[in-house]
């Protein structure tokens, strides 16, 4: 393949993941002054600035994962399966941001994050069968998601008065 083709794929992959990342950042930053700042959080939750950059890092790594899967050849059924699982994982991650920061549904977001982790593990297994290099970028995302999930659980436990399914109208 031509170098331009790879460059185009890299840009497309990063943009495809950074657009949902922008949505996640928007949801995070708009909830900081209100709901999120009022939550009791465990001591290991980093400052809002660090979380901001961690979100960017996660979505950049997801973009590199997508690029690597794409370059493995979507015509192969194993790679296509990894690609579809990856898209499902990306969708669940964005849905977690919507659930947690927009709907303010910490318990529901915890369920979504557990689902995202389960699908990401399936994605990782599929990637190891078809596009091994993509695992380099996906494993740090999985580690960050496990930390987020644990923080989410602690927030649910520390803020017992939160509505289970989100904002109460």
Language-model segment annotations:
Residues 1-15:
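N-terminal membrane topogenic signal
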Residues 41-54, 169:
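Short aromatic-rich membrane-water interface segments that cap or initiate transmembrane helices
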Residues 30-44, 161-167:
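Membrane-interface helix termini and inter-helical loops of multi-pass transporters
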Residues 60, 64-97:
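Helix-adjacent hinge/juxtasegments
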Residues 17-33:
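Alpha-helical transmembrane segments of multi-pass membrane proteins
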Residues 96-108, 129:
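Membrane-interface helix caps and helix-loop-helix hairpins in membrane proteins
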Residues 2-5, 70-80, 128-136:
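Membrane-interface helix-boundary motifs at transmembrane edges
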Residues 126-169:
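Terminal transmembrane helical module of multi-pass membrane proteins
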């Amino acid at each position: 393949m031509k170098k331009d083709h790879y460059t185009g794929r890299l840009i497309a992959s990063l943009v495809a993941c950074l657009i949902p990342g922008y949505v996640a950042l928007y949801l995070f930053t708009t909830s900081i002054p209100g709901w999120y700042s009022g939550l009791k959080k465990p001591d290991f939750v980093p400052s809002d600035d660090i979380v901001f950059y961690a979100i960017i890092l996660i979505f950049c790594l997801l973009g590199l994962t997508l690029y690597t899967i794409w370059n493995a050849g979507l015509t192969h059924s194993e790679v296509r399966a990894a690609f579809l699982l990856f898209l499902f994982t990306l969708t669940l991650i964005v849905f977690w941001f919507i659930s947690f920061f927009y709907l303010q549904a910490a318990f529901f977001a915890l369920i979504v994050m557990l689902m995202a982790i389960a699908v990401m593990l399936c994605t990782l297994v599929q990637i190891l069968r078809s596009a091994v290099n993509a695992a380099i970028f996906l494993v740090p995302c999985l580690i960050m998601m496990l930390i987020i999930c644990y923080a989410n659980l602690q927030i649910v436990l520390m803020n017992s008065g939160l509505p289970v399914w989100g904002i109460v109208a």
